[in-house]
């Protein structure tokens, strides 16, 4: 699928689109790219229009200075505005979940569902531990995925990875969480070595009505480690809302 570009304020997002239906926007994490969703897109696109984003400074949108989480969220909010996306499901992994939390707060009328996978946002810690913990966190899961992690980190470059890490550790979403109105699913890998499951439980407890699901034997890159289970959790969560809407009609 050919990549498209969205430009605003001197920044460039890269994205590609597949499928038809209500929109799903996938936002990758620190040092990642849209390719991290490769095992999820076919299942999600069966009944939805899926937008797979490469954040500024990452993936196909590299050779740019990475944005902080709040600026990245403002750009994605503008992206949903300009493309006229309604009833949006935002799915974010790690830093992408952190960004999606901000987007849900910025656009409560557009964002209907929020899925946070091993998300930062309540993460505290030493920048060296977080930046250097990424390769270790990947190794706790599917070993065949490690080359992708390293290739994407190399493409983004150490300066962007460092900049993003510094920014996300300085940004805490705790005060936003009680105001989130989107139906929210929080999914975690039980073996997440970077953002521990207790952080996921705290996120879910702070968001009104949020559900928490933990996948055994999956690590930080939960949607790669356990794609079938991850896809089923997300699709079941979305289907519940569709059934409820049909019942009200």
Predicted regions span which residues?
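Alpha/beta-hydrolase fold catalytic core
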Residues: 1-24, 45-49, 85-86, 155-156, ...
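Conserved HGGG/HGGXW glycine-rich cap/lid loop of the alpha/beta-hydrolase fold
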Residues: 11-62
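Conserved acidic catalytic loop of the alpha/beta-hydrolase fold
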Residues: 71-88
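Flexible "cap/lid" loop of the alpha/beta hydrolase fold
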Residues: 98-106, 110-142
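Hydrophobic, aromatic-rich cap/lid helix
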Residues: 146-175
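Short alpha-helix in the alpha/beta-hydrolase fold that links the catalytic acid
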Residues: 173, 182, 196-205
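Short beta-strand/loop motif that positions the catalytic acidic residue
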Residues: 180, 186-188, 192
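Catalytic histidine-centered segment of alpha/beta-hydrolase-like enzymes
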Residues: 218-231
